[in-house]
Swiss-Prot record:
Lineage: Bacteria, Bacillati, Cyanobacteriota, Cyanophyceae, Synechococcales
Family membership noted in the UniProt record: Belongs to the IlvD/Edd family.
Pathway linked to the protein: Amino-acid biosynthesis; L-isoleucine biosynthesis; L-isoleucine from 2-oxobutanoate: step 3/4; Amino-acid biosynthesis; L-valine biosynthesis; L-valine from pyruvate: step 3/4
Residues involved in Mg(2+) binding: 81, 123-124, 492
A Pfam family the protein falls into: ILVD_EDD_N
Protein name per Swiss-Prot or TrEMBL: Dihydroxy-acid dehydratase
Reported function: Functions in the biosynthesis of branched-chain amino acids. Catalyzes the dehydration of (2R,3R)-2,3-dihydroxy-3-methylpentanoate (2,3-dihydroxy-3-methylvalerate) into 2-oxo-3-methylpentanoate (2-oxo-3-methylvalerate) and of (2R)-2,3-dihydroxy-3-methylbutanoate (2,3-dihydroxyisovalerate) into 2-oxo-3-methylbutanoate (2-oxoisovalerate), the penultimate precursor to L-isoleucine and L-valine, respectively.
A GO BP annotation: isoleucine biosynthetic process
Amino acid sequence: MPQYRSRTTTYGRNMAGARALWRATGMKDEDFEKPIIAVANSFTQFVPGHVHLKDLGQLVAREIERAGGVAKEFNTIAVDDGIAMGHGGMLYSLPSRDLIADSVEYMVNAHCADALVCISNCDKITPGMLMAALRLNIPAVFVSGGPMEAGKVILNGEERHLDLVDAMVVAADDRESDEDVATIERSACPTCGSCSGMFTANSMNCLTEALGLSLPGNGSLLATHGDRKELFLEAGRLAVKLAKQYYEQDDESVLPRSIASFKAFENAICLDIAMGGSTNTVLHLLAAAHEAGVDFTMKDIDRLSRKIPNLCKVAPSTQKYHMEDVHRAGGVIAILGELDRAGLLHREVPTVHSPSLGAALDQWDINRETATEEAKSRYLAAPGGVPTQEAFSQSKRWTALDLDRENGCIRDIEHAYSQDGGLAVLYGNLAEQGCIVKTAGVDENILVFSGPAVVCESQDEAVNWILNGRVKEGDVVLIRYEGPRGGPGMQEMLYPTSYLKSKGLGKACALITDGRFSGGTSGLSIGHVSPEAAEGGLIALVEQGDRIEIDIPNRRIHLAVSEEELAHRRAAMEARGDQAWTPKDRDRPISQALQAYAAMTTSAARGGVRDLSQILGSR
């Protein structure tokens, strides 16, 4: 039977010094026999998704103590991708994921904590903490800060529901008045919480439910609603319970790696495909699987994407629905329930809160006769409609649940938005290791597309060309040297896609990059091209005007240039010597921190994880 890790610092005469320090934090004699639960918070005033978390760590801590544990809170960093977007700050976003994972590992292992509660929310914080939890493999529970309410505004006599992307698009549209732009800017992000659409943050928080590491409603219950408080309290109680199950009952089934198995990762990507989640989730799931020691790859994602339909369409793929609407329709559990009825889910996998996912569905799927009154009540939590930065500040409820699986926010298999899933992996000579497209956001008229390449050596160059009218209908904008190594940091391309929309080209052009896209991106936007340009990928050899062919139904992407010509171009590239596979005429200062990241990172096809052999082998 395993001993509490914390006894390393609390047991025996030789630990008198450590105990003296523990006492200085408030611990007493009786506490040294209890499990020490680390509360990894991520409060910051920089990020609306985290601005309300300041007191929530202590809320969880007090509940841990009531449940018989000792709580010790610490904080990680959190980058706001929306604020960091469109300038050099975005270079730091993906690298911050590794920094967050490392910081959680450092704190938990340095102090020998027994279990972990992860209070996350936004884009890189949830995946960073997820990587850490799977790396540490001690009992862990996730609880996120919750989604933001959708913005609401009256324009031209009509109510519009808004999010961050609307503000970006209208600001670049010369047809919009300054007054309307200002109105939308002030209304788009009305409350604390992660941005209100199915962007990266909300996608990842939904996936923690499918992986079995968070409670029902975690991905969709609004940050402002009083019902969300119970998720935080239950997370604290659950962490103590799981710690005692593992250390006192030798029950390894409660460990993160036992829960997040290969089958659980399959469930997670099936949810992702069904709900049309952010393409960034692919990057993060691959990285999490790597930490868990699970052999889950792009080929698995490709295989499942061919049989999972698109059952939920939310902003940015449509402005009709936001996360508050997903919640009213039953949230993640409802989507999983529809997949389960179609035989597309592994029901037997365990979760932190139920003996199996199947048992959880029976209790929490609001479209089942076995659904509890607690479940029906939880999913009635509605937006309050009052701007606020305060968690749990309102208690408004819908008058009825959205149980319509034919025309509602969440559909059943027979009435799917499309039988083709919301995410797809494309392969071809331009992406031999694969690339990702969010098909849920692609207009059906351009699922098959070809056009001349407009080659840009950076995101900045692409933005300049789009805004200055150099990109025309039918073009394929190609942005390269923005991958994990080439950027470095694999920037998001939300501004280029938003500006294409503002110019009326959102359904008339394609955009391809070895970088990535914001969860707020829609349109024919293909990212994660692997291998990236900096690794010798074919994307580095594309020239202006080359024809690029995209066929999403057949999962194909192809550069229509002869092998002989490509061989000639490759030889010319290699002849550049030390400058081979680097961008021409790009002046971008790179800090030592980012250089270190670039030296160790890998391709998007591997999740952009660290591979130390790349530097150890050079010694």
